[in-house]
A protein has these predicted regions:
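N-terminal Rossmann NAD(P)H-binding glycine-rich loop of SDR-like oxidoreductase domains
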Residues: 10-12, 16-18
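Catalytic loop of short-chain dehydrogenase/reductase
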Residues: 83-89, 98, 120-172, 179-192
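Rossmann-fold cofactor-recognition segment
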Residues: 45-60
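Conserved glycine-rich Rossmann-like NAD(P)H-binding loop of the short-chain dehydrogenase/reductase
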Residues: 24-39
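Conserved N-terminal Rossmann-fold NAD(P)-binding element of oxidoreductases
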Residues: 4-9, 31
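C-terminal helical subdomain
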Residues: 177, 193-244
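Active-site Tyr-X3-Lys motif and surrounding loop/helix of classical short-chain dehydrogenase/reductase
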Residues: 67, 89, 93-102
Length: 254
């Protein structure tokens, strides 16, 4: 039996992963953005190992989330599932960051740095990361004209690079990125063509399976098959530049 923390587990793929893991007998620590969203998890929460509440767009609340998770105890796996898509405006988090960058990239970066090293790390990427450029100028969209699709693609490229950088820097902690496909969740929309019932299975497999493939590190996965991510994400120099930029924006180093 494993203990797993899943961000964004109030709905969509995070909720599906939580249900599957709890059904299989694992201890799952749930996460919801607000008390209102947490209240919808009453039935599942009663069978979970706890529920942590906090907005991943706020660095203060991210730190609180990390503290609560650490108080529960060391995790066997952390699934960085939470994300936002097609945000119509840049937004402005309490720290002044673009909302998409804050939730999709800065939050998992900070949680990776602040939560005690788990036995496994899983980061939910997207095939759209391949459409992002590899420039790290103005990643927070301070000067550029806002483009929701580009911002999302870039945030997932940085996240993929983060996953592979952690795999390289922390060899004792298997770290992998997952493309769940375009699935009909609240974020993906009702017209998404992929199968919702399959979208969470790779990350749950990576979190708990003793299969030799699931114990490997530095992979980019889609439906339990390793694929090639964008070339930039594989390059150690780019990975290190991403970590440096994220460290600069958050004041926290990995």
């Amino acid at each position: 039996m494993s203990r797993i923390f899943i961000t964004g587990s109030a709905d969509g793929l995070g909720l599906a992963a939580a249900r599957t893991l709890i059904h299989d007998g694992h201890q799952v620590v749930l996460h919801a953005r607000s008390g209102k969203r947490a209240s919808a998890l009453d039935e599942l929460a009663s069978r979970s190992a706890g529920i942590v509440i906090g907005d991943l767009a706020s660095e203060r609340e991210i730190r609180s989330i990390a503290e609560e998770v650490n108080m529960i105890g060391r995790m066997d796996a952390v699934i960085h599932n939470a994300g936002v898509y097609q945000v119509p405006e840049r937004g402005n988090t309490p720290e002044g960051h673009a909302t998409v960058l804050a939730v999709n990239t800065l939050a998992p970066y900070l949680l990776t740095a602040l939560i005690e090293h788990p036995k496994r790390l899983i980061y939910l990427s997207s095939g759209m990361h391949r459409g992002a450029g590899d420039s790290l100028q103005d990643i927070d969209w301070v000067q550029r004209r806002w483009n929701p699709t580009t911002a999302y693609s870039e945030s997932k490229l940085y996240l993929t690079a983060l996953a592979l950088a952690v795999a390289r820097r922390w060899p004792a902690v298997p770290s992998n990125a997952v493309d769940p496909g375009w699935v009909p969740t609240r974020m993906g929309g009702p017209g998404a063509p992929d199968d919702l019932t399959l979208g969470h299975l790779t990350q749950t497999w990576l979190a708990v399976s003793e299969d030799a493939q699931a114990l490997t590190s530095g992979g980019y996965w889609h439906h339990r098959k390793r694929q090639s991510p964008a070339r930039a994400a594989l390059e150690p120099d780019f990975q290190d530049q991403v970590l440096a930029k994220l460290g600069e924006l958050t004041g926290v180093s990995i």
